[in-house]
């Protein structure tokens, strides 16, 4: 909102000069809050009229088209005076540099208004969306439970196929929602649902675009794993059938077979290491022992933390405590954890674009750009 306000102040200062010079009339006293609200109110109509997507890459022609739709009389400083639109003022500017500056200012206003409108819409739908995520998560955990209780791969494959439509629909929904990560965070941090400023901060950090996802998929496909044979089982067969139905895979020009092969190898490595890696077992035991000194298991039982909704509620109600525990344990065991993961990466000859993977760099990047923002 602050960026939008600053852009509007620039717009007002430049407009004031040209309106007064061209009409000989003094502008009224400006009320920035009212004018900003007025602009945001008409923005959805304005967006529909210009027919183009409002973003940083839009052309000057699109910005000028938007100027034609905005009349000065809607603002307090020129309220109900002449019906001059913003483009008419642009036409009065003879200096090329000033004209380009005015177009840039109005473009910034449009882009920031788009962001604010998006945040307001997300804010309005947040509770409904988070409830839907919980229901999806319960369904996924139910499917996982059925697979774990299956006697063999054929039974597990049958369970997956029976839930094929739900899995495809859920993956498409997650990848199509640029704010999905924020909604996951909102499950554990209720401030996001009630605080638009916090929501705007999180949107800057955790939102993702379709282009981001496609780029991530392509980067993932640049991973090579030479230390393990190709995995061939019913689970791999299932996901080779599913991914061609995922919209972003259809538009990313990535071979789904290649993606599944890499993912199946990584999944197999993770599963195997969790079962057999002694250093991991020691690390997990130390973390759990430390956790039990900070959180009473009996108290958790009394608070009925026995399902996903109970866990979400527990973390949400005691967010600062759990955040502090996480930070403390991570700092205490960070060096050991990085060493373990780096050894696993090296043992399986996992490379990215034919170069060795630097696990410490990845951990530091995630901590600096994402975890520290929570």
From Swiss-Prot:
Keywords: Virion. InterPro entries: Poxvirus_A6 (IPR007008). It is found in: Virion. It holds the Pfam family Pox_A6. One of its GO terms (cellular component) is virion component. Belongs to the chordopoxvirinae A6 family. Plays an essential role in immature virion (IV) to mature virion (MV) transition. This is Protein A6 homolog. It comes from Fowlpox virus (strain NVSL) (FPV).
């Amino acid at each position: 909102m602050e960026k939008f306000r600053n852009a509007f102040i620039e717009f007002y200062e430049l407009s004031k000069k040209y309106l007064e010079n061209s009409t000989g009339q003094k502008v009224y006293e400006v009320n920035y809050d009212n004018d900003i609200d007025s602009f945001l109110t008409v923005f959805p109509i304005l967006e529909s009229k210009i027919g183009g997507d409002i973003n940083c890459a839009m052309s000057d022609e699109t910005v000028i088209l938007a100027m034609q739709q905005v009349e000065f009389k809607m603002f307090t400083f020129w309220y109900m005076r002449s019906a001059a639109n913003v483009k008419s003022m642009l036409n009065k500017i003879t200096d090329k540099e000033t004209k380009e500056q005015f177009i840039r200012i109005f473009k910034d206003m449009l882009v920031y208004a788009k962001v604010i409108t998006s945040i307001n819409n997300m804010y309005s739908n947040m509770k409904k969306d988070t409830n839907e995520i919980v229901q999806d998560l319960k369904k996924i955990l139910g499917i996982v439970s059925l697979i774990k209780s299956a006697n063999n791969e054929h039974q597990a494959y049958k369970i997956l196929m029976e839930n094929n439509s739900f899995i495809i629909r859920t993956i498409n929904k997650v990848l199509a929602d640029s704010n999905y990560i924020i909604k996951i965070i909102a499950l554990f941090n209720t401030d996001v649902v009630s605080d638009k400023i916090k929501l705007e901060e999180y949107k800057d950090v955790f939102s993702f675009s379709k282009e981001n996802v496609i780029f991530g998929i392509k980067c993932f496909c640049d991973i090579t794993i030479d230390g393990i044979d190709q995995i061939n089982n019913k689970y791999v067969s299932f996901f080779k059938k599913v991914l061609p139905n995922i919209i972003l895979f259809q538009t990313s020009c990535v071979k789904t077979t290649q993606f599944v092969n890499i993912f199946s190898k990584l999944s197999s490595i993770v599963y195997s290491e969790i079962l057999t890696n002694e250093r991991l077992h020691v690390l997990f035991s130390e973390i759990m022992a430390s956790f039990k000194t900070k959180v009473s298991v009996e108290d958790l039982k009394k608070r009925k933390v026995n399902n996903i909704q109970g866990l979400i509620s527990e973390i949400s109600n005691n967010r600062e405590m759990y955040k502090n525990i996480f930070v403390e344990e991570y700092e205490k065991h960070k060096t050991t954890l990085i060493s373990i993961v780096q050894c696993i990466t090296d043992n399986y000859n996992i490379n990215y674009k034919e170069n060795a993977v630097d696990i410490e760099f990845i951990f530091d990047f995630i901590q600096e750009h994402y975890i520290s923002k929570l």
